[in-house]
Regions:
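Bacterial N-terminal signal peptides that target proteins for export
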Residues: 2-14
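A broad, structure-centric signal for solvent-exposed, well-ordered loop/edge residues
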Residues: 8, 58, 901-905
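Bacterial N-terminal signal peptides
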Residues: 11-24
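Catalytic metal-binding/acid-base residues of hydrolase active sites
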Residues: 18, 432, 882
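Exposed boundary/loop context
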Residues: 19-20, 49, 535, 724, ...
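C-type cytochrome heme-c attachment and multiheme electron-transfer modules
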Residues: 25, 29-73, 77-81, 91-696, ...
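Early compact domain cores of eukaryotic multidomain regulators
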Residues: 86-88
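Membrane-embedded alpha-helical bundles that constitute the cytochrome b-like, heme-associated redox core
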Residues: 628, 634-661, 668-917
């Protein structure tokens, strides 16, 4: 029995072992099969497709470079896409003769990268007919290929012909090239191929931008798009060229699903050409100086990253306290395409106000998704940046901040929200500081030892210090942006100044000196020319440091000009320009955004802080702003006491009046002068009265007690007095917050408005009372005897009061005012008070009735008038209070205005003046 049990147990054990072995073997085979298979394709909805060459043949058969136009064109209308993309066109379609570009430089030939000269990259795309070649079309593609998506001028000539059909010609800038030794040779486009619009660059998850750029720099234009696939495993590179990987294709010649890595463009795709984008939250972000391989970051300091600045690898001053993200939108996982979408994308498309029927607020009709995928418009929604002028008809096509955000939350702390939103762009407060360096100056008047320009950056002291260089960042300058809708706004900018040499060609046309000629003027046998060293090397150490390598004397300028003249360049001279670069990213919120009213509303406000353009002025030439930037005159270029060149903001030049910051000096001096003269006159007059009273005491006059002021008269008088005094005080805080910084500006604005409302209501009720009661008559001068009695009253104040003489006019309940008082109140109540109310109301209502306020001149006119009248009211109060002391006793009139009862002098001749009885 036991043996049978043992045998059965052994059998079960063996069976279990066999089953486990089978499972293990099967599992191992399954695991092996899983390892052999690649992960799921990135885009399961995108079908597999063959790679086709320019002739439409499969590249596996031809071994030729891939044609994106043919490959992607199997399903998508690539001709439509390429012709509807300013990224591809780059200004080719707007190309014209030099100097004919609207608001461009004298030598610009288009408004895009192909034809618009950039002093940072310097090289000039030579137009046909120019005597000197700087950069031909092939040179342009080799030099700037890292920022060229292909198509447009990379495939098409300036006359619209395919580049590959042009015959090599050393005399044409479209079919020649300038060699390193300065010689010019023909370029054969049929051999190099052209660079089609590279769909892979934006629509693959891992495009090899470096390999593509290297192919373009080598002149292998036809293979550039193929090189973009280097990291996908579809193609490999060897010394003999590029080879297609047959294992990446199925038996029918189409890509295997796992190699179809097509996707919507991501931030990383955009970053290849634009600027620094960091998406890996686990890896600290680093950056190096003003790296021009990230042009947007180098020119603006903008970094697209959701990482907290404190967690980055950048060496920033007080970094530990910077708990904010580099960019709040990147932190919230927004992509570039969420704002810069295809204009016909059915999810985002919005019709222009000029074409949408006026009765429609929203048009629900959209492209079918299939129609959109076949013909997506690659003209992307864009903003109004100052530096990018290509395709101006597409500016302001993107949704802005207000499309997604409401300003309601600002109402809890920001007065005049609508007015602020009208004058200020959102970025003005929400991009208060950039924490990456940016280019400040590019100086091509001198050259570094490697033949490059001298560049200085703002926000860091060591632009060549690597990733450990200490960075402070910088505060952008606010300038008035001319918006497409005609409503200008203050917006943040970085300003890059540039100096360079220009010359006159044989036709008298101005051109920038070609780089090769500039280098030939500066160097001999790879070293600085001896005659230049004799002038520049002040310490005679055989090298040029940064204090020597600068055009800061007439002798240096003349020496370089002579060397350029020797190169055959006519009339070489230095010119300078300033290019504003718009800043729209690196947005922050909450405590990191500007929330302090006095950031703008004071003399030394950040709004008025100058931005340095250069530490000195190369060649003594003051630069001017480029003409094609969408900015209005809102500042001046000035030289500081330290010799540096600055841009000094002055928003008032563009019609912006900022309380507490802007004021008209002569208005203040005039008002203050009148006030002080009155105060001095009162002091002198009162002192003489006191002195004469001590010498000749005035005999006590006969008095009678009269109920002079009713309760309401006293109420409105004291209420008006308190309101006016507090209005003057709060107005002074608003006008000069720098002098009274202990008071909260926002609360003073609110209190000023409330007091103005009280004054207005009180004045209206007082007018109603005086009209209905008939008391208004005492304020109206009567012609009969008015001037004679006015003279008598003036004589009393100027002479007789010092003798102790009685008042010439008897004061009664029905006639409280003497002729001079009537005249004063006539102007006060009929001119000054209405003027102050009207100007104040228009200033308050500038956001409710901007058109009406604009018809009155806007704040630049209303505020100074309001200020001057306020000075006159302050002057009136001083005179008025003093004159109340001229009664029988010093406090008689004031007591009367408190109790209503007044002791008045008895005049025996009162009946002779019935008009004042």
């Amino acid at each position: 029995m036991q043996r049978r049990f043992s045998t059965r147990l052994l059998s079960l054990t063996l069976l279990l072992i066999l089953m486990l072995a089978a499972v293990a073997l099967g599992g191992g085979q399954a695991a092996a099969q899983t390892d052999a298979a690649t992960a799921k394709p990135l885009s399961p909805l995108h079908p597999v497709f063959p790679m086709l060459d320019a002739d439409g043949r499969n590249v596996l058969e031809s071994g030729a470079p891939v044609s994106t136009m043919q490959t992607c064109g199997s399903c998508h209308d690539t001709d439509f896409i390429a012709s509807h993309s300013f990224h591809s066109d780059l200004g080719l379609s707007s190309m014209t003769a030099p100097g004919q570009v609207a608001n461009g430089r004298a030598w610009d030939t288009s408004n895009g990268l192909f034809g618009k000269w950039d002093p940072i990259t310097y090289r000039y795309l030579t137009p046909a007919g120019d005597e000197r070649l700087d950069m031909s079309t092939a040179d342009w593609l080799m030099t700037l290929g890292a920022r060229v998506v292909g198509g447009g001028p990379a495939t098409t000539s300036r006359n619209g012909e395919a580049l590959t059909t042009l015959a090599p010609d050393a005399a044409s800038p479209e079919t020649n090239i300038r060699n390193a030794d300065g010689t010019i040779s023909a370029w054969d486009w049929s051999e190099s191929g052209a660079a089609e619009m590279d769909c892979f660059l934006c629509h693959l998850d891992q495009p090899d931008h470096a390999a593509r750029t290297a192919a373009l720099a080598a002149g292998d234009f036809g293979w550039a798009n193929t090189a973009t696939l280097a990291a996908t495993g579809i193609v490999t590179q060897s010394t003999s060229g590029w080879t297609w990987n047959t294992s990446a294709f199925d038996a029918e010649g189409a890509l295997l699903p796992e190699y179809v890595r097509v996707q919507d463009p991501t931030n990383a795709n955009c970053a290849q050409c634009h600027g620094l984008v960091h998406t890996d939250a686990a890896t600290p972000l680093t950056l190096t100086g003003c790296d021009t391989t990230n042009p947007q970051t180098a020119t603006t300091g903008q970094v697209i990253s959701g990482q907290k600045i404190a967690e980055s690898g950048v060496n920033i001053v007080d970094k530990a306290s910077l708990s904010r993200a580099w960019d709040v939108h990147a932190e919230r996982q927004l992509a570039c395409t969420d704002c810069h979408y295809a204009l016909n994308n059915p999810m985002h498309a919005q019709e222009s106000d000029t074409t949408r029927p006026s009765h429609l607020v929203y048009d629900p009709r959209r492209l079918d998704i299939g129609e959109y995928l076949e013909r997506p418009n690659h003209n992307f929604a864009r903003g109004q940046s100052a530096q990018f002028t290509v395709a101006p008809e597409l500016k302001d096509t993107m949704r802005r901040c207000e499309s997604c955000h409401t300003v309601a939350s600002h109402g809890s702390w920001l007065p005049y929200v609508d007015r602020h939103m009208t004058v200020l762009s959102c970025e003005s407060c929400h991009v208060p500081h950039l924490y990456a360096p940016a280019i400040e100056k590019v100086d091509w008047t001198v050259l570094n030892a490697d033949g490059s320009s001298v560049v200085s950056c703002r926000g860091t002291e060591d632009i060549n210090g690597g990733i450990d260089a200490l960075i402070e960042g910088f505060t952008p300058v606010l300038m008035m942006r001319d918006n497409i809708d005609g409503n200008p706004q203050l917006a943040p900018y970085n300003l890059i100044s540039a100096w360079y040499w220009v010359y006159d060609d044989a036709n008298g046309a101005k051109r920038p000196v070609p780089l090769a000629d500039l280098q030939a003027a500066w160097f001999e046998d790879g070293a600085y020319a001896a005659d230049l060293m004799a002038v520049f090397d002040s310490n005679r150490d055989g090298a040029l440091d940064e204090t020597e390598l600068r055009l800061d004397s007439d002798a240096k300028t003349a020496a370089v000009a002579a060397r350029l003249t020797a190169q055959g360049l006519d009339n070489p001279r230095v010119e300078g320009e300033v290019q504003p670069y718009s800043i729209n990213h690196n947005v922050t919120r909450g405590e990191w955004a500007t929330r302090d009213c006095q950031a703008c509303h004071r003399d030394d406000a950040a709004l008025n802080q100058p931005m340095q353009l250069a530490g000195f002025t190369p060649g003594g030439v003051t630069p001017s702003f480029v003409n094609d930037a969408n900015i209005a005159n809102s500042g001046d270029i000035v030289q500081g006491e330290d010799g540096a060149l600055y841009f000094q903001p002055a928003p008032e030049q563009a019609g912006v009046y900022i309380f507490g910051s802007n004021r008209i000096s002569w208005i203040d001096w005039l008002g203050l002068g009148i006030f002080l003269l009155t105060l001095g006159a009162v002091g002198l007059h009162g002192g003489l009265r006191f002195y004469m009273t001590l010498r000749n005491p005035r005999p006590k006059p006969e008095l009678k007690r009269v109920y002079m002021y009713d309760v309401y008269e006293r109420f409105w008088h004291w209420l008006q007095t308190v309101a006016i005094i507090l209005l003057i005080f709060t107005g002074l805080v608003i006008h000069r917050p720098d002098m009274l910084g202990m008071f909260n500006f926002r609360y003073m604005v609110w209190l000023h408005n409330m007091l103005a409302l009280i004054l207005l209501v009180n004045a209206a009720m007082s007018l109603f009372y005086h009209l209905t009661s008939g008391a208004i008559r005492q304020f109206i001068p009567r012609p009969y005897g008015f001037f004679d009695q006015a003279i008598l009253q003036a004589q009393f104040y100027l002479r007789n009061i010092f003798k102790g003489a009685p008042h010439p006019m008897e004061k009664t309940k029905d006639q409280k005012l003497n002729p001079l008082q009537q005249l004063t109140y006539f102007w006060l109540l009929n001119v000054l008070l209405p003027l102050q109310i009207v100007t104040g109301a228009l200033m308050w209502g500038v956001q409710q009735w901007p058109v009406v306020a604009g018809m009155a001149g806007g704040l630049p006119w209303l505020a100074p008038i309001h200020t001057l009248v306020a000075w006159l009211f302050a002057t009136f109060i001083v005179a008025h209070v003093y004159l109340t002391t001229t009664g029988p006793a010093v406090l008689t009139d004031i007591k009367a205005m408190i109790t209503g009862w007044e002791d008045v002098e008895v005049h025996g001749h009162a009946e002779t003046h019935p008009e004042h009885a």
